[in-house]
Each structure stands twice: as C-alpha cells, then as structure tokens.
Amino acid sequence: MQDLSMEARLAELESRLAFQEITIEELNVTVTAHEMEMAKLRDHLRLLTEKLKASQPSNIASQAEETPPPHY
C-alpha cells in the first residue's frame, strides 16, 4: 500500500515539474521579448533626446558665462 502511495506522490511531483518547466519557458520568452522592447525604447529615447537638444539651444547660461552672486 505504501508503494502505491509513493508511486502516486512521485507521479504528482513529475506532473508538477513538467508544468513548472512549461511555465518557466513561457516566462523566459516573455522576459526576452520585454528586454528587446526595452532596448528599442531606450534607443528611441536616446534619439529623441539628441534631436531635442539639437533643435533647441539652451537658455541656461553655462557656468563660465554666469555672473557670480553679489556677495562674492
């Protein structure tokens, strides 16, 4: 009787392991797709930032152009 119980437990564990492996593979595919999408979005953000900087001159004076405060 104990052998049957042990076999049933082993079969249940094998079944769970199989489902976990499938789930892990699905999650891996999802994570990989998200990483690729994030890389594309970073590239787009970098390009947009460069375009924005190139199209608008800064209204903020550089440190060398800035006059010192009156207490100096």
Curated annotation (Swiss-Prot):
Name of the protein in its database record: Protein SlyX
Cystine pairs: none
Region feature Disordered, mapped onto this chain: 52-72
Pfam families xref list: SlyX (PF04102)
Matches recorded under InterPro entries: SlyX
Gene that encodes it: slyX
Biased composition (Polar residues): 55-65
Record-stated family: Belongs to the SlyX family.
TM region positions: none
